[in-house]
């Protein structure tokens, strides 16, 4: 089977410099959703017709299995499909999809393809309560499709028809070439419409078959930011419903966004206003508090993530405790039972089993062993303005508050570092590290007082 995806439109109503089909839905371009669905049908040829912003669109979705045809002039859907003909296998049927219709299920498309077997012409239709603006499917007394009539050309009787054309079709490819060549652009827009092919197929004696999607929203397209927002909410609610079926507890299914892939174990609980991006895995018994962002991360079983935590590119072991207001950046790796508390940032660092950094700390480019306590205000000074260096803290170290560790530096096993210490040399195992300081109390000191104006 050939699949052609039309993605050449300008999208003027989007009021954006970005090509319409590249606007994101759930974190991915609209066109990427359509291509992903198309791939599930295993086409022998997958062709995307580009036009407006062609180079940008091609760069965004380029892949070994995707070919591109260019529609240099915007002369209608029929003209667009004609540009793809040289790339199609004429012996196989062609399914035509749209790059701005991202939510059509693969099962819906397969049902249409199956119905159009043996050279039939298939149309995906939908019945709407309000079909205003759409082309109507006209049938004869026996129920056979005779034509598609556009809203502006419909008679009062035809305007009562609720079944409309979605534009998604399956057609014999060899005949399609002939039909497209016969199209005329005698309309107000001066364009060649793919819908006009239906009458040519009927005249040629081809049987027209129709199928419908399970849900009307599967055929909704995007022509404005308002429509994009509407489809985003439909998609996110579908994702939330699927999570609920899997046994995930959602505090409010309307207030969780998944912009990628979210895999959840048993008894996972997610509070409100959480966003999951990229590839995220939550193991059994993970609890995610409100207002968290988790991107490209693996979260171990029994972990608790408190409110307003941001996790990006991190790997967490089992029974860790994160947040509130913590930030784990790419390369952060936490072993089982590690704690990272409020206003702690971890980047490209390993934190060992049972180690804790509970408050106001920066840990970057570091290797921290097991059972280490990192006091409040500790900083690994890892950057000299040009190069990054690592800090190594071995097992059972106690780091006092307001400590600066100037990398590269190694702190041996069982070391205690006194509060307020700057460590710039390696510290031997089992010792106390401190900076000698003198504290003086001066009597008779008078604090300055502001003069009153």
From Swiss-Prot:
It is found in: Cytoplasm. It catalyses: alpha-D-glucosamine 1-phosphate + acetyl-CoA = N-acetyl-alpha-D-glucosamine 1-phosphate + CoA + H(+); N-acetyl-alpha-D-glucosamine 1-phosphate + UTP + H(+) = UDP-N-acetyl-alpha-D-glucosamine + diphosphate. PROSITE patterns: HEXAPEP_TRANSFERASES (PS00101). Acetyl-CoA binds at residues 376, 382-383, 401, 419. Coiled coil: none annotated. Catalyzes the last two sequential reactions in the de novo biosynthetic pathway for UDP-N-acetylglucosamine (UDP-GlcNAc). The C-terminal domain catalyzes the transfer of acetyl group from acetyl coenzyme A to glucosamine-1-phosphate (GlcN-1-P) to produce N-acetylglucosamine-1-phosphate (GlcNAc-1-P), which is converted into UDP-GlcNAc by the transfer of uridine 5-monophosphate (from uridine 5-triphosphate), a reaction catalyzed by the N-terminal domain. In the N-terminal section; belongs to the N-acetylglucosamine-1-phosphate uridyltransferase family. In the C-terminal section; belongs to the transferase hexapeptide repeat family. Homotrimer. This is Bifunctional protein GlmU. It comes from Burkholderia vietnamiensis (strain G4 / LMG 22486). The lineage of its organism: Bacteria, Pseudomonadati, Pseudomonadota, Betaproteobacteria, Burkholderiales.
